Amino acid sequence: MINFSFSKKISFLILIFITFLIPLNLKGMHHERELDKMKIFELYEDWDIAVEASDIDGYVNSLDENVILIPPDGPTITGRDSYRNFLGPVFEVATYKLEQKTPRDIKFYGDFVTVEYNIVVYINFLGNEKSVPSEGALQDSVSDSIYFDLLKRQEDGSWKCLIHTWRQIN
């Protein structure tokens, strides 16, 4: 015969365990999400610094190995090395100043994140340059754009940009 009082005790203990485990797990998930947001904000801070410093290595460090750049007025560029080649002329002929107009809107989808934001890029052409020779690069001295990025969580837990694109609104 089954001892029902024992079964009730076990059921009660399981219920208590689940009652306390679920909130702890949700707190852990919330903490992990906040940690991920901090890592993402740090990624963008480093990326913005690299742009304003014309630092190709710093910029490329923000990119996934299989990054895809989709400029609105140019060919799609695939891979970190191709992106690096694209950036060479971009930083050789101009310097850049960024003004963030909206906070970065971050949405999580497991190991992927979408980020949408509005930034004004001020381009200061160097010497007698009047344009950037990289096809698809920003050309206007003031460029107000909505950016959309897809980030991918890396094996080490960091985040890198997998897809980068924008829509110019000025």
Task: Map each language-model feature to its residues.
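N-terminal secretory signal peptides that target proteins for export/translocation
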Residues: 1-7
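Hydrophobic alpha-helical segments, especially transmembrane helices
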Residues: 9-10, 154
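Bacterial N-terminal signal peptides
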Residues: 11-22
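Cleavable N-terminal signal peptides
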Residues: 24-26
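A beta-strand edge to alpha-helix "cap/lid" segment located at domain peripheries
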Residues: 28-43, 49-58, 68-170
